[in-house]
Amino acid sequence: GGSTFLQRPRFLALSEFGPRSLVYHEGRAYRVVRVRIAPSGHDAMADGSQLPSRSVRICAVCGAAHFDQHSNACHACGVALADAQTISALYRIENVDTEPAERITANDEERQRQAFELQTTFQWNMRNGVPDVRTVGAADAEGDVLRLHYGSGATITRINKGLRRRRDQSVFGFWVNP
């Protein structure tokens, strides 16, 4: 059969549209079979190079994302990024192709279900080279109880690091063969 186009909110699609995942739409089951490479990705690969990707460092203390590899300290909490987790070759997947799945039992579905390791990160917007963040605190007689940081223009990024049960937990993502 042919492929079927399904649309999902991006945050949901990240966990639903992983390789070989089952997706339910209008009472039918579909299996993710391939990634649709954006036209800009095809252009970049025309000369035999790789998909256009980015790297990120994630602060071990607060979870802030640093796509700018030049900073030595976290833009959110100020901690040195020496212990930050680095994830290389991030590629933003816009669409996937699915095919109708064969009928399967609930037991087969549970056996085939794939759990992905997802991580949510953030980046504060910068204004004049300074994070555009408002901070509010609450304290009692013993000191700080709560400190809240709010950035109206923060960028939230969700990363699918791969299967939770992958063999090597230090290797992230999936192979893409366009």
Where in this protein do the model-derived segments appear?
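Accessory interdomain/linker segments of ATP-dependent helicases and helicase-like nucleic-acid enzymes
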Residues: G1-S21, A29-V32
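Charged, low-complexity interaction segments
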Residues: G1, L14, S53, R57-V61, ...
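Inter-lobe coupling/hinge segments of SF2-like helicase ATPases
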Residues: P39-S40, A44-A60, F67-D68
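Short, Lys/Arg- and Gly-enriched loop/turn segments at beta-strand edges
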Residues: A29-H42
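Generic detector of short alpha-helix boundary/capping microenvironments
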Residues: R8, D47-Q50, A139-E142
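Hydrophobic beta-strand core residues of beta-sandwich domains
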Residues: F17, H66-F67
